[in-house]
């Protein structure tokens, strides 16, 4: 990955709320399925904004911080996804998205961020990201002290 796109908590909240506004009316949904781990925080925001209390998870391991590896389903939510929103933070190459589509063919699959290779696999997303860009999510970062330039 050549570029980095840093996401702050504020940015994530704004993007998730914009996405939630397009998922109204909320009474059309039975619940939300969060793709663990990237979809957990966005799912919480969507659940709040839409007033949805039923939130389940599908647990898929594919990344080890900045390396994408073999896809492994650790836990899945029951059903075919009918009436459910499935949320992940990002669709990248489409590996996870293809697995989600197979497991939940009737779900409405959304992400906050989408790269070109994965875009056709989601029903909606909020932010376009170039394919070669690595996204730094706020839950993967910490605020640290940086010395002033004059002190170096």
From Swiss-Prot:
Its main location: membrane. 5-phospho-alpha-D-ribose 1-diphosphate binds at residues 37-38, 88-96. The keyword GTP-binding does not apply. It is found in: Cell inner membrane. Pathway: Purine metabolism; GMP biosynthesis via salvage pathway; GMP from guanine: step 1/1; Purine metabolism; XMP biosynthesis via salvage pathway; XMP from xanthine: step 1/1. It comes from the Bacteria. Xanthine binds at residues 92, 135. It is a peripheral membrane protein. GO terms for molecular function: guanine phosphoribosyltransferase activity; hypoxanthine phosphoribosyltransferase activity; magnesium ion binding; xanthine phosphoribosyltransferase activity. GO terms for biological process: GMP salvage; IMP salvage; purine ribonucleoside salvage; XMP salvage. Mg(2+) binds at residue 89. Keywords: Cell inner membrane, Cell membrane, Glycosyltransferase, Magnesium, Membrane, Metal-binding, Purine salvage, Transferase. It is an enzyme of class 2 (transferase). InterPro entries: PRibTrfase_dom (IPR000836), PRTase-like (IPR029057), Xanthine_Guanine_PRibTrfase (IPR023747). Its EC number is 2.4.2.-, 2.4.2.22. It catalyses: GMP + diphosphate = guanine + 5-phospho-alpha-D-ribose 1-diphosphate; XMP + diphosphate = xanthine + 5-phospho-alpha-D-ribose 1-diphosphate; IMP + diphosphate = hypoxanthine + 5-phospho-alpha-D-ribose 1-diphosphate. One of its GO terms (cellular component) is cytosol. Purine salvage pathway enzyme that catalyzes the transfer of the ribosyl-5-phosphate group from 5-phospho-alpha-D-ribose 1-diphosphate (PRPP) to the N9 position of the 6-oxopurines guanine and xanthine to form the corresponding ribonucleotides GMP (guanosine 5'-monophosphate) and XMP (xanthosine 5'-monophosphate), with the release of PPi. To a lesser extent, also acts on hypoxanthine. Homotetramer. NCBIfam families: PRK09177.1 (NF006613). This is Xanthine-guanine phosphoribosyltransferase. It comes from Yersinia enterocolitica serotype O:8 / biotype 1B (strain NCTC 13174 / 8081).
């Amino acid at each position: 990955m050549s570029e980095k796109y840093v996401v702050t908590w504020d940015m994530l909240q704004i993007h998730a709320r914009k996405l939630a506004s397009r998922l109204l009316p909320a009474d059309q949904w039975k619940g939300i399925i969060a793709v663990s781990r990237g979809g957990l925080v966005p799912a919480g925001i969507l659940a709040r904004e839409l007033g949805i209390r039923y939130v389940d998870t599908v647990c898929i391991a594919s990344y080890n911080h900045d390396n994408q590896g073999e896809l492994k389903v650790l836990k899945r939510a029951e059903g075919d996804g009918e009436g459910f929103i499935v949320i992940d933070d990002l669709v990248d190459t489409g590996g996870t998205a293809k697995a989600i589509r197979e497991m939940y063919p009737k779900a409405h699959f959304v992400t906050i961020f989408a790269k070109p290779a994965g875009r056709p696999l989601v029903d909606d997303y909020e932010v376009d990201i170039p394919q070669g860009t690595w996204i730094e999510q706020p839950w993967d970062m910490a605020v640290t002290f940086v010395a002033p330039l004059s002190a170096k």
